[in-house]
Design a protein with these regions (language model features):
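A catalytic-pocket lid/entrance helix-loop region that shapes and gates access to the active site
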Residues: 169-181, 254-314, 360-371, 375-385
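Catalytic-loop region of hydrolases
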Residues: 2-11, 26-184, 189, 457
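Glycine-rich nucleophile elbow surrounding the catalytic serine of serine-hydrolase chemistry
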Residues: 133, 223-224, 242-254
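Alpha/beta-hydrolase fold nucleophile elbow
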Residues: 233-245
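Alpha/beta-hydrolase fold active-site neighborhood
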Residues: 49-51, 313-470
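C-terminal motif of bacterial Sec signal peptides marking the signal peptidase cleavage site
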Residues: 21-25
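Active-site-proximal cap/loop segments of hydrolase catalytic domains
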Residues: 167, 173-224, 228-232
């Protein structure tokens, strides 16, 4: 389930500043930080860490993204001729056992366009999810950050468990396609039982196929990977741009390594103090607000969906209910149901330049044409949204992206909550009040970790000494 982005720069600034101040209390001791970092232990561990920190990266021209990264073509050169370079970083499978097994993380970078005197260092991006491939995403979004490249090397990576970084797989030929499962059951019977069964069977498939890595794909371990990357890149500080889930990853990094935090932007801040249910509720409100902004814009543009934002929101709620009962057939044998409608809308809300396409798609649905929104959802997918899993991914196809599987694995590793149907049903009124459009889906997404085979725990995000979060990167 996707995570809402900030609506405006002003909101981002105030939210980020509040986050910084809220993370400074109750700081852990140096001994506790060393335990969390995995830097204590035996002489063997110390030597292993030294070897990891002094490794060299073998940068080469990037190939096309692998199927697990979402596929596609090799990234084209930037307008000034700069070629994208890719490498792998060797890191411990388990940071609490740094002398044990290692895994490789996929990296990508574009060198700065500035002079050596202008260069500040590397700027590391995480575009959210969790589950999104940074290696596949960064080239497509690079035009948005070209000004930053005058001062930084632009760098991203596939976090552990994602894409080409020991990507989690939950393949099982016996699993139904997720599109066949009603994600917002309202019958309290067969539909609800089918959703519960799907989540539990998916969890079992994840253990069967990726059980060795499942305990180690959480955000705390990923943050430790980022500090290793900082050192191997030769930077004294980590300069960081995190979007959506990437803000949580940045907050955990700041908790573990406050002395190495450089310039940082957290865009669309996720509140790290909320449990999974409260976070989902906040997301529902965020999506509702974003859709109301779209609806206001649409009305001002004279779209045929309604005379004002209230009319457009009401019409869309009605469309979702109608499509839930009677999906629209689309060319190629597909269909647009209520869940698919919400997926398409939520994906298009991440950027205002997607709004015209969303307007056209919704107007087409009112004329019984679901093809436009189906195509929009497919076009946005992971890379267009900046971090939201694409529910159209076929998790039984080994040639498909693993973004959904990674989303599930990282989410469940980062939470001790294992919600039940009763938990969801008791909170549904709150979600419906927050958003009749997005609330039900986000409420039922709380069942994602039901039956998960390994225990989880929320990452610590106290971040003593984090300082100012949002700064001018140029």
């Amino acid at each position: 389930m996707p995570t809402a982005r900030a609506i405006s720069t002003a909101v981002l600034l105030s939210t980020a500043t509040l986050l910084a101040s809220s993370l400074t209390a109750c700081a852990p001791s140096d001994q506790e930080r060393d335990r969390q970092r995995g830097t204590g232990g035996t002489t063997t561990d110390a030597q292993a860490l030294t070897n990891l920190r002094t490794q060299s990266l073998d940068w080469k021209p990037c190939a096309a993204p692998s199927p697990l990264q979402g596929g596609g073509e090799a990234p084209a050169a930037l307008p000034d001729g700069t070629r994208w370079q890719c490498a792998t970083l060797r890191t411990p499978l388990n940071w609490k056992d740094p002398s044990g097994e290692t895994i490789d993380l996929a990296l990508i970078r574009a060198r700065t366009s500035g002079t050596p005197d202008d260069r500040i260092g590397s700027l590391l991006f995480n575009f959210g999810g969790p589950g999104g491939s940074g290696v596949a995403t960064l080239p497509g979004l690079a035009p948005d950050y070209e000004k930053l490249r005058t001062r930084y090397d632009l760098v991203s990576f596939d976090p552990r468990g994602v894409g080409a970084s020991s990507g989690v797989r939950c393949l099982d030929a016996g699993l139904p396609d997720e599109d066949e499962i009603d994600q917002t059951p309202d019958d309290g019977g067969d539909e609800t039982n089918a959703l519960v069964r799907f989540n539990r069977e998916t969890a079992a498939a994840c253990k069967k196929n990726s059980g060795d890595v499942l305990p180690y794909v959480g955000t705390t371990q990923a943050a430790q990977d980022m500090d290793l990357l900082r050192q191997v890149l030769g930077d004294d500080e980590l300069h960081y741009f995190g979007i959506s889930y990437g803000t949580e990853l940045g907050g955990v990094y700041a908790h573990l390594f406050p002395e190495h935090v450089g310039r940082a932007v957290l865009d669309g801040v996720v509140d790290p103090t909320q449990d999974a249910m409260e976070e989902a509720l906040a997301q529902a409100g965020g999506f509702q607000l974003a859709f109301e902004h779209f609806a206001n814009w649409c009305a001002q543009q004279g779209c045929t969906l309604g005379d004002d934002a209230e009319d457009i929101v009401g019409l869309t709620v009605g469309l979702e209910e109608t499509l839930d009962d009677t999906p629209l057939a689309t060319p190629g044998g597909g269909e647009l149901d209520g869940d698919a409608l919400i997926d398409a809308i939520s994906g298009a809300l991440y950027r205002q330049d997607y709004w015209p396409a969303l307007r056209v798609g919704l107007e087409a649905v009112t004329d019984d044409n679901g093809e436009v929104l189906e195509d929009l959802a497919e076009a946005l997918g992971q890379h267009g949204r900046g971090g939201a899993p694409d529910d159209d991914t076929d998790d039984t196809d080994p040639d498909e992206s693993n973004e959904d599987d990674a989303f599930r694995a990282i989410t469940c590793d980062d939470s001790s909550n294992r919600y039940t149907v009763a938990d969801v049903q008791s909170r549904l009124p709150d979600f419906l009040e927050a958003s009749p459009l997005f609330g039900p889906g986000l409420a039922w997404s709380a069942l994602t970790c039901d039956g998960w085979p390994v225990p989880g725990a929320a990452p610590a995000v106290l971040a003593e000494g984090f300082g100012e979060v949002l700064q001018d990167l140029t």
